[in-house]
Amino acid sequence: MDCTVKWTGEGMSFLAETGSNHALIMDGAPEAGGRNLAPRPMELLLAGTGGCTAFDVVMILKKGRHAISGCEVNLKA
């Protein structure tokens, strides 16, 4: 797995490009020099943690042939 993160040259915005050919923008809070145009890097870290957890739970339940009506992970940091 790999990822490249580049500063866009504007404020505190960064472009991340993943090894699976996806891209996303990250930005900082205005008080930190950002423009609040995209999620903060730490918010994406939290979202990734929740996404990995939900992914694993759903995958395990599907492998066990359980009926799944939903899955929601709430995180706070």
What are these regions (language model features)?
Residues M1-A47, V58-A77:
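Extended beta-strand/beta-hairpin segments
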